[in-house]
Amino acid sequence: MKDAAQQQEPVSARQTQVHRKSSKPESPPFIFDNPRIQPNTYCMVKLPSENFRVVKLIPNQTISIGKFGSFQVNDILGLPYGYTFEIQEDKRLRIIQEGVDDHDYVVGAKGALLEPEETNQTLIDTSESQTLSMAEIEEMKKQKTLSGKDIIDHVIKGHNEFHKKTAFSKEKYLRRKEQKYLRRFTPQPMCSSLLLDFYLEKDYKKVLDMSQEMLALLLSMANVRPGGKYLVVDETTGVLTAALMERMAGEGLIVVAHENEHPNLDALKYLSMPTELQDRMIKSINWLQFFEPEGEEEVPEKTPEQIASMKPRNRGAYFRKRNRWLELQNVNDLVANQGFDGLIVASTLHPASIVDRTLHAIGGSRPVVVYSEYKEVVTEVSQLMLKDLRVLAPSIWESRVRKYQTILGRMHPSMTSRGGGGYLVHGTRVFPNEEVNATQVRNRKRKREDGDKTKSSETEGKSEESVEPDTEQSAEPEAKLETDADA
């Protein structure tokens, strides 16, 4: 019997192991990073002037990038992101090898270390130092046989004071000319950080002046992870929601609360996310449906016979209403059962009121993060959290990144940079225990401290009394000695 039982144990273990394997999801997490350029997707094009341009890669079309030229979309499809292309004559492209094709028109300009005694003291850099006129330079730009590197070579040769410049000055001069004359571009995949930079340059009000470092700090403070359920108030044109989807890797739920008929998530179209993924992860609810769920009209389920008898147009409308009503019921269940893993607010509405009215839907030990471009707003939210026993340890955060120049052995911060970036207030959702009265514990502690003080004072008094008789006794022999001496 024991042998039979021992033989059956591995079988049951294998069955359990097979059952565990089958319970795992078959499809891997969704990955947003596509290493190759795909057609009919949006792409961020980095120009030599350090500016960005968002373009849609439609096959068999030509994309113009301003003064830097134009190129055919078919020439870059299927190639990896990150390559730098140079536009040649007849709109042909050539891949630039970084580190090999850079600055080879000036021998020794790059790689030469700057000596400590080298200065620009004898340099007189005026407009007369350049022998080429603007008309001649514009004529060279119109010639299709000359590349941007050839134009820079002619400009350097026509500069009478270039050889007097230090290596550091030469490097900065070359970079300025590259930004002006090189016909190059670098396609980069769309992501939330690049999309945020694009909106900051285009219209920073659309993203509430949020910087990259503050977006990263917000995601870290909110503990955004795959499989989480988050209540989000997003008025950054959908950039915040896109960042959450990237961090969650296609697993979890994002409930976007809004004040209009539909939420403004226009930025999601630039990331080329599948529509099925957006419908599965993102659910929207307006404030009226959030605060008064009983006012929503119920859409009852119909029998297959009733559905078959409906017209195709009415059948589609019924399924849309029914699915929408079921989504609202699921969201209301999360609100009632405190099923959200975090509250993230980035809105122009009154954040203190939003936190006060939505905090009941957040689970225990879950983060509450509020972003605002103004310090006064987050200070008001912090004061509200300090008075509210449902939030523990609120704190205000600020993060700034400063760019540095690293050229030929020198490193110093950039002299110009944009301000702003916003502020965060972070707290932890807790459930206070109303039965515990901390005042009694504090009074007992005070009584205990007072008792210790009285005991210590009594012991000090006794020690002083014990010392006084000794001093009197020690003084008596001295008096006797004095009387003997007088005698």
UniProtKB/Swiss-Prot annotation:
Q: Where is the composition biased (Basic and acidic residues)?
A: 448-465, 477-487
Source domain of life: Eukaryota
Q: Name one GO cellular component term.
A: tRNA (m1A) methyltransferase complex
In the record, biological process GO terms are: tRNA methylation
Keyword terms = Nucleus, RNA-binding, tRNA processing
TM region positions: none
* Predominant cellular place of this UniProt entry's protein: nucleus
GO MF, any single term: tRNA (adenine(58)-N1)-methyltransferase activity
Q: Polar residues: which segments have biased composition?
A: 1-16
Task: List, as start-end ranges, the regions of compositional bias called Acidic residues.
Answer: 466-475
Task: List localization entries.
Answer: Nucleus
Q: Where is this region: Disordered?
A: 1-34, 434-487
Assembly, per entry: Heterotetramer; composed of two copies of TRM6 and two copies of TRM61.
What protein name applies here? tRNA (adenine(58)-N(1))-methyltransferase non-catalytic subunit TRM6
Q: What is the lineage of its organism?
A: Eukaryota, Fungi, Dikarya, Ascomycota, Saccharomycotina
